[in-house]
């Protein structure tokens, strides 16, 4: 089982989504305003957790492709 740490960007992107990233994602390195979501076995669970916290969450195209809707 491969567990990774995820965070959600608190600043929505141009489409209104709060992107969820693995903390090791190179596209997350520039994010200064984020909330750690915790450890999950897959990105879908991380995005579901962010949505349960009230975010309009979507997975990062690069590190959370299975949870990326657009």
Where are these regions (language model features)?
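Short aromatic-glycine-(Arg/Gly/Cys) micro-motifs in beta-strand/loop hairpins
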Residues: 5-34, 53-55, 62-70
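Well-ordered alpha/beta subsegment
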Residues: 45-50
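Absolute protein N-terminus
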Residues: 1-2
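A structural signal for short, well-ordered beta-strand elements
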Residues: 38-39
